Structure formats: structure tokens, C-alpha cells
Amino acid sequence: MSFNHFDEQGQAIMVDVSGKEPTLRTARAQAVVRLRPETLQAILDGRMTKGDVLGVARLAGIAAAKKTPELIPLSHPLAIHHAAVEFATDPETGEIAVTATVRAFERTGVEMEAMVSASVAALTVYDMCKGSDKGITIGQVALLYKEGGKSGVYRREEER
């Protein structure tokens, strides 16, 4: 098995994608935040002391997608054409499913941008709620979907 993030001497490199043709790339990723149900209800009712938790988390996730190459060393800087963050809440369990979608017309995929976006949005929910709920967890960070490029379409089993 060869690893394309290393040169012949075993040194880390950023993969050369200059010879690839740009194509439309889309990726969707998710992270799940678990809070106490009463904390989630306070978020939904707009009663959190730090303000609009989901609004701020949405903006943080979008900004994070654009900052991915600054956080992931071998990630390519990309001209992102679309970034969105959505939330699905379950008041009974206290779960927030954070879903990030990123799109670009590029030579390499946007999976890392979607993963970073969902993760940072989830971390922002944590940051804004940690004062009132010490038991918050974040998990199930996963790529749900990707398309574009020679590898074609990937859809996570749970999404099929």
C-alpha cells in the first residue's frame, strides 16, 4: 500500500493535484451533540445566556469550512462555493445532529472541509452551553456523502 501524503524519503507532503481536472465536489458530514433535554429546550426557546446558540454555531461551522487548510496541515486551500450547516434536534434525547454541506469546483474533494465544519459547529454548541450543562458530549463525527472526482459517489450505509 502506498501513501500519497509522503515522498520517497517518507517526508510528509501535500499531494500534487495540479494535473487533475476540476470537477464539482460535494461533501456532507455530521457530528452529534448530546445535552440534557432541558438544555436543548433552553436553546430552542432562546433562553441561553450566551445568546443564539444554533445561529452562532452555524456561522462558526461555515467559517471553519473556509479555514480547514489552516487546521489540517496537508489539506489544500480551496475556493469553496457553498457551505451550509443545519441542525436536527430531538427534544426527548437532547441530541442535536449537526450536518455540514460543502461544495466547490475543484481538483480535490471537500470532505475535510465538511468534517471540520460539522465538528467546529458542534464544538461551538458545547462552548456556548458548557456553563449550564457540564455533561455535554460530542460524537459520531462522520462523512455521510461525497461526490465528484474519479472515485465517484460515496454514501454512508446509514444514509442509503
Curated annotation (Swiss-Prot):
Q: Which GO terms describe its biological process?
A: Mo-molybdopterin cofactor biosynthetic process
Name the PANTHER family on file: CYCLIC PYRANOPTERIN MONOPHOSPHATE SYNTHASE, MOLYBDOPTERIN COFACTOR SYNTHESIS PROTEIN A
What GO molecular function annotation could you give as one example from this UniProt entry? Answer: cyclic pyranopterin monophosphate synthase activity
Q: Which SUPFAM superfamilies match?
A: Molybdenum cofactor biosynthesis protein C, MoaC (SSF55040)
Keyword Membrane attributed:
no
Question: Residues that bind substrate, according to the entry?
Answer: 74-76, 112-113
- Report which reactions are catalysed by this protein: (8S)-3',8-cyclo-7,8-dihydroguanosine 5'-triphosphate = cyclic pyranopterin phosphate + diphosphate
Task: Please explain the role this protein plays, according to its UniProt record.
Answer: Catalyzes the conversion of (8S)-3',8-cyclo-7,8-dihydroguanosine 5'-triphosphate to cyclic pyranopterin monophosphate (cPMP).
Q: Name one Pfam family in it.
A: MoaC
Q: Which InterPro entries match?
A: MoaC (IPR023045), MoaC_bact/euk (IPR047594), MoaC_sf (IPR036522), MoCo_biosynth_MoaA/MoaC (IPR050105), Mopterin_CF_biosynth-C_dom (IPR002820)
Stated EC number for the protein is 4.6.1.17
NCBIfam families found in the cross-reference section: moaC, PRK09364.1
Out of the domains of life, which is the source?
Answer: Bacteria
Tell me the subunit arrangement: Homohexamer; trimer of dimers.
Give the positions the UniProt entry annotates as the active site. 127
Question: Per its record, how is this protein called by name?
Answer: Cyclic pyranopterin monophosphate synthase
What is the gene called? moaC
Name its pathway. Cofactor biosynthesis; molybdopterin biosynthesis
Give the UniProt family note: Belongs to the MoaC family.
UniProt entry keywords in alphabetical sequence = Lyase, Molybdenum cofactor biosynthesis
